[in-house]
Amino acid sequence: MAELPMIISVDDHIVEPADTWTSRMPAKFKEAAPHIVRKDMPDVTFVGGKLTVNEGGGGAPADWWIYEKLQRPLLRVDSAVGVPRDEVTMKGVTYEDMRPGSYSQKERLEDMDENHIEASLCFPTFPRFCGQTFTEAEDKELALLCVKAYNDYQVEEWCAGTGGRLIPLIIVPLWDAHLAAEEVRRNAERGVRAVCFSEIPAYLGLPSIHDPDNYWDPFFAACDETSTIVNMHIGSSSKMPSTSPDAPAAVGSSLTHINAELSMTDFLLSGLFERFANLKVAYSEGQIGWIPHLLHRMDVVWEDNRGWGGVADKVPNPPSSYFKDHVYGCFFDDPNGLRLIDEIGEDNITYESDYPHSDSTWPRTRQIAEKQMAGLTDEQRYKVVRGNAIRLFGLDFT
């Protein structure tokens, strides 16, 4: 068996530096832009899939993002690499408490070298996984400037000068599909091929992808025309799965793949891939073992319930037939999924390290990948750990 190729991780994260927005805002918006304040941290709970910052002072100092009415502390779970598992909690932290690779380009590249990672696609933290923070904001003029500032930071600072090792991933103003399309095209002109989107936009109070007025068509058309990949991270609907309001966090964490299942069902039964032949979607951190069953079930429903299922007119072919050309799964720990690689398709699977989150396999991503993929051929391993990502995002690697 050949040596494991250098990995391209399509799901990592960046903790934005404190001046990400203040350094890029027009003078009249500098004070209102997201900024960091250091203050004591009260208790934080994560129960029933909901994060709650409890009222009251006390506690150790933490760095807080302040933006409109939002006060959001940096948390240990935002940057958990290098920390013993028992110390990875919901407590607040400062930048000095975090591993520098969480927010600094130089140290991130060094940590990637240590982890056998050649290139990395990073999702945002303060904006949340698809820019929900700005979608929920009251001042939409400022919010649009914040979206553009974040994208400028991604392209001009975070990814700049890395020889393609850090792959730009932008956010868009989801509250206006036409503005979102403009932002996709603005960034495509400077080489960006990846955009964040919500796995289930209806959960955000936005139109669903089944909207009868085709609300999202301008956005999807822009992605289709520019070959921009639509990336959906678990939790990008701001609603994590859980079983009850008092269920412990471990329940929801064990069920995170469900959001990806819901979303993929939505897309494959939407007719979007009929109307946008070049549209491609990628699911981040959803794992892959569930894919064969879901494809089979959708095909059965499509065939047996075509009289009343509501999709016969817009999905003329079995839903599974659209998967190969349009949908990509991603995993960091799914040995069961790898045993189903022939059913899923070796060309539709990508890999991740999830740096610097608590699920991250850093600094042992290579060793874990080698163990998980021991039953794959050299060609399959190449495709999973880098080849499919190169093809999907048009990366300048071999």
Question: What are the language-model segments listed below?
Answer:
Residues 142-143, 158-159, 164-167, 172-178, ...:
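Catalytic pocket-lining loop regions of alpha/beta-barrel enzymes
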